[in-house]
């Protein structure tokens, strides 16, 4: 499928899907669309890495379509004590921690509360790494890495994943997301080599779920099922 750069040679989208909602039936369909945009990597030495939970369902379709290996980059936001949906930072699979200092400067959180949140999130990430990857060592990151999520809203967790991958030797990072807000994409643009996003949107209101006809949150067991299904079909994860 032909792609087109938007105002920057590193951004590739699908013009017919710009500023539209409900353009994908589900995450699986979004993954297939992205795979068609990433066809140059078919059968290459690239590695597809999904961000659990939702990104795994997109990533598995890219890996299947392009005959590439699949792995995951576990990342979790550090949530506020009074709001589990909002976060002031994130922790990545290798222990990388990134805090939103601008947000923290506006919050009345004590150092103890901040450190407690970090510790709890580190434990959660470690548990998920074991659940999803077992005791397998980290893969070789010195090859093209296609980092996949189901959408790009604020971009904070993606930035933590990118920082962790860079810290482990990744030199060629390609971000693949079905949908993104244009301003968030600009913020993350210089941190990767290329961004593939079929549904690029702008405006005051943005929700990742609006790109999909069918949307539901995925849990840990959904991720395990997806990874096991891919492993059974391909012989490796």
Predicted features by range, described:
Residues 1-237:
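PRPP-associated nucleotide enzymes
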């Amino acid at each position: 499928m032909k792609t087109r750069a938007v105002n920057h040679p590193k951004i590739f989208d699908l013009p017919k899907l710009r500023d539209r909602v409900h353009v994908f039936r589900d995450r699986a369909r979004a993954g297939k669309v992205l795979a068609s945009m990433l066809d140059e990597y078919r059968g290459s030495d690239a590695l597809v890495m999904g961000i659990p939970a939702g990104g795994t369902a997109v990533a598995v379709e890219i890996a299947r379509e392009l005959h590439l290996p699949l792995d995951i980059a576990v990342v979790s936001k550090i949530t506020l004590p009074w709001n589990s949906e909002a976060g002031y930072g994130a922790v990545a699979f290798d222990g990388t921690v990134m805090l939103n200092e601008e947000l923290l400067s506006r919050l009345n959180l004590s150092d103890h509360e901040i450190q407690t949140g970090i510790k709890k999130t580190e434990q959660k990430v470690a548990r998920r790494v074991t659940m999803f990857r077992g005791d397998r060592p980290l893969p070789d990151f010195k090859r093209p890495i296609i980092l996949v999520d189901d959408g790009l809203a604020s971009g904070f967790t993606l930035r933590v994943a990118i920082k962790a991958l860079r810290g482990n030797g990744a030199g060629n990072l390609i971000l693949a997301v079905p949908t993104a807000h244009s301003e968030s994409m600009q913020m993350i643009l210089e941190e990767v080599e290329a961004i593939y996003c079929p549904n690029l949107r702008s405006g005051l209101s943005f929700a990742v779920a609006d790109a999909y006809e069918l949307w539901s949150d995925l849990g840990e067991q959904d991720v395990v099922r997806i990874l096991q299904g891919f492993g059974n079909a391909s012989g490796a994860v």
